[in-house]
């Protein structure tokens, strides 16, 4: 093990939540350590239980994809919603997607629309595409093709500017 990993481990053993989270990320990506899904899950779950917002959102992803743990869409939804409730704005769009497709929760296009709109209102670029689709198909709202095309154009414009 290298010195950076040992330093992070020492802080984690002392209860430093950011270090605990860091160990989870280290194990997930093989940074300073070998990749290890189970250890990544262990430390991300521990950080999440200590209130680390990004860890809570990551735990939702782990449960959704069965990363280091048995796949469980209901637990994934629980942690995604918890991340949003605790202020993790980056988790809002994904919560909308879970409502739209009934992932871990009963399908609810109205709530999906609500969360996509909320995500767009705070500047989430990906949410523009989902919200456009809602307006196009009338999911959770009255169909509005003009609004859908406007949002789709804005999404394409923002993606183009991000990639240049």
Labelled PLM ranges:
Residues 129, 133-137, 142-160:
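TPR/TPR-like (Sel1-like) alpha-helical repeat modules
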Residues 1-30:
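N-terminal segments that cap or nucleate solenoid repeat domains
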Residues 11, 46-47, 83, 118-119, ...:
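Canonical positions in the second alpha-helix
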Residues 13, 31-35, 49, 65-71, ...:
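Short coil/turn and helix-start
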Residues 20-29, 33, 56-65, 69, ...:
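Hydrophobic face of amphipathic alpha-helices that form TPR/SEL1-like repeat modules
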């Amino acid at each position: 093990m290298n010195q950076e990993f040992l330093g992070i481990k020492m802080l984690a053993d002392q209860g430093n939540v950011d270090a605990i989270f860091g160990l989870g990320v280290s194990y997930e990506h093989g940074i300073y350590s070998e990749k290890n899904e189970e250890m990544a899950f262990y430390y991300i779950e521990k950080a999440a239980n200590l209130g680390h917002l990004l860890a809570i959102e990551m735990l939702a992803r782990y449960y959704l994809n069965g990363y280091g743990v048995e796949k469980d869409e209901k637990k994934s939804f629980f942690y995604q919603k918890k991340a949003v409730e605790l202020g993790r704005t980056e988790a809002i769009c994904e919560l909308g997607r879970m409502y739209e497709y009934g992932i871990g929760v009963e399908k609810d296009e109205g709530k999906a629309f609500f969360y996509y709109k909320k995500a767009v209102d705070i500047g989430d670029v990906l949410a523009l595409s989902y919200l456009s689709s809602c307006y196009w198909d009338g999911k959770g709202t009255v169909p509005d093709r003009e609004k859908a095309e406007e949002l789709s154009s804005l999404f394409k414009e923002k993606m183009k500017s991000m990639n240049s």
